[in-house]
Amino acid sequence: MATNILTKIFGSRNDRQLKQYRKSVVRINAMEAELEKLSDEALRGKTQEFKDRIAKGESLDALLPEAFAVVREGSKRVMKMRHFDVQLLGGMSLHNGKISEMGTGEGKTLTATMPVYLNALTGKGVHVVTVNDYLANRDAQWMGKLYNFLGLSVGINLPNMAREEKQAAYRADITYGTNNEYGFDYLRDNMVYEGADRVQRGLNYAIVDEVDSILIDEARTPLIISGQAEDQTDLYIAINKVVPLLQRQEGEEDIRTGEGVTKPGDFTVDEKSHQVFLTEQGHESAERILSELGLIPEGATLYDPANITLMHHLYAALRANHLYHRDQHYVVQNGEIVIVDEFTGRLMSGRRWSEGLHQAVEAKEGVAIQPENQTMASITFQNYFRLYGKLAGMTGTADTEAYEFQEIYGLETLVMPPNRPSRRDDQLDRVYKTTREKYEAAIKDIRECYERGQPVLVGTTSIENSEIIAALLDKEKLPHQVLNAKQHAREAEIIAQAGRSKVITIATNMAGRGTDIVLGGNVSKELEAVEADETLTAEQKQQQIDAIQAQWVQEHEKVKALGGLRIIATERHESRRIDNQLRGRSGRQGDPGSSRFYLSLDDSLMRIFAGDRVKAIMDRLKMPDGEAIEAGIVTRSIESAQRKVESRNFDMRKQLLEYDDVANDQRKVIYQQRNEILDAGDLSAQIASLRAGCFDDLVRQYVPVESVEEQWDIATLEKVLADDWQLNLALQQQVSAASAITDHDLLTSVQQEADRVFAAKVEQVGGENFTQFERMVLLQSIDTHWREHLSSLDYLRQGIHLRGYAQKQPKQEYKREAFELFSQLLDAVKNDVTKVLMTVKVQSSEQLEQAAEDMESRGESIANVTYMAPTETGEVETITDDETFRKKSTIPGGNVPRVGRNELCPCGSGKKYKHCHGKLA
């Protein structure tokens, strides 16, 4: 009560904000007469003038009135459309990073041109986000005329475009595209192995059309790119044949005495650390056997750059054969390897060991080797769109979700007044006892409309529902069209004509969205056909245009007199917002219209939430079959049920986000590291830091911090450094010879020797060649471990709710364990990279360059690439497309086939494409 009184005195926040904006509207309108006097050239020149003023430090807010006035004038000349004052208000709210709620037919597409133009003047790019490719294409071409007239470039970002086409689209001042494609481009940019292959150039400002659909309805499903890294099935089988030919060493050599080995062999097994190590003899045996099998050239070593992955496979096969035992660590079930939980003894179906171990066990058991289809990258829309410096959105229905927009995205919702007040009659719901009675009543209403010539739009919540209505209309011999949000371009044409007399259109909620239903139909296509007909003289064209327009006015007035577009719905949606969207299809721009919902107690929403209450009312009133209850109390009780569902869905989305926020913080760290590695000219500081950390960890296992000599295990440390790291240090001799030595002195000795050995390798081939090799090793290690980490997080997430039974807070446990997993990932990258760079044997710069290129090719060759994304209809779409991920550049200015970066350049220079014309692409 008190709130209502205060609102009446001071106005709502919405009113106060609009009052503020109206002052700017007055200023914009005052400039109109002056701008009308300018020539087209002078008006276009304003764009450069604004850019110069921004460069000198003028703010966009200061430029807003002039820029908006210029766009309005440009639109009058190019589009023959003048922005209404309410559209100026909407444009200001979008520029200020808010959500602008504007009713259907209020011209959201035209409204967006003003903030898009203003923000594009900075040169940092503006992204306009739509729900489907058809709308992106339509709006880019439609509004592109205005932007081009004002001297700004426009790009369209569509799926299946080649890499340089996408780069051109993102380089444009304004880019149109779908939410899914922007998100996938962001993920793909963080999977490339060359900085020049990235397509996006920073996320500056985005305007999201149908913002409720994209940021709320589709926000429960993350975008996921999954795929198989290089299929190496044959290699796993071949390496498995090597293992029986290697002998296990019995006993362990004591370095001081040289004794302890009872039977020399090729490898030792350390049960405690669950690791296998090749001996000096083992390296020679393995190299000989691999050479005989044709897996490595004669005379090559396991530590040659090209053979690094073989070493990895060999160790995986040795561990699979000597450390992992059937019916103890795993079972074979239905031709698959199923892991046994070592603590509970339960089978862990669907879980796989990482780093190639699972495939090695499959090769050992002779079952089919499953190529690993891993999640390569994923992100939720909430986290993607929060990356933008400024975000805004527009829709016809946002107010019911204003709290969620504020809570999740920090976006305020402003409701714009209509240009003309709505004359739509939203009638009370009619509730029937059974589905049969409901459909009979709806069909009766449709028939009556058809007979009097009034157009009808029948809204359904599902494709199944629309098919039921279509079948009933067929039975009644009533002509109709069905739209299911599948063929956007065709459906936009059909929905544009849904306002003609006697037309019955059945549509699911999203079908034809973004297209206005004009009473009397849309004649723009017919007018365009006349304009394009070159056989007609100018006079004949004008006559035909006048005739078409006169016919349309007649049809328009006839439909208005019949009551405008009739909306009939056969079910309430879970969300009030979707119901409001359906109603909003009618009564655009002050046109007449009406809407009615026909419901039954069998509808899922009624059954779950409101059925008993309404049924009790019906029973009390002793309602006969075929009679409906039509009362405000029933409509209110249904809306209360919808509020409950909305609240539950909000909680689900919020919970998804809270869990994804954990992964998102880690994703930002990994992606930032990747981008720094791609952009860095010199990686020596990063590599030195990793090396120092790695040897610090290693030495501290045998020489603890601030410990005394009696606690040191120098002999084992010396052996590990020699066997695993190829560092030969006489540490025992150093300790014996020194009168006083600390643990820190030993660590310094090891690190200095590691630095010396590494520096010698770099010097041998030159810093520049080694940097590219370092880059590939780093990227491949980060990518491999990040993908495994995503699988681990997914697995952790699936079972984390069970912690609640142990009186633990699942969310806190997830955060804690995810952090531990991430720390392990960083340690694994540090050790992997250091190990490869320390043990690689470098013969020549050519050999090293070839190894780097092989690693790049392996990293980029992902098979069975699968894209998972939500669709407008609420389903999850899965697209498998190998080509999309690997689209390469073409040389501009000619019909040249696509060329891989490591293939020879088609210009005939004999150089690799990446070192020739690839640099220009």
UniProtKB/Swiss-Prot annotation:
Alphabetical list of PANTHER family matching this protein: CHLOROPLAST PROTEIN-TRANSPORTING ATPASE, SECA INNER MEMBRANE COMPONENT OF SEC PROTEIN SECRETION SYSTEM
Annotated source species: Albidiferax ferrireducens (strain ATCC BAA-621 / DSM 15236 / T118)
Known cofactor(s): Zn(2+)
EC number: 7.4.2.8
Gene: secA
Complexes and interactors: Monomer and homodimer. Part of the essential Sec protein translocation apparatus which comprises SecA, SecYEG and auxiliary proteins SecDF-YajC and YidC.
Location in the cell: Cell inner membrane; Cytoplasm
Domain of life: Bacteria
Protein name according to UniProt: Protein translocase subunit SecA
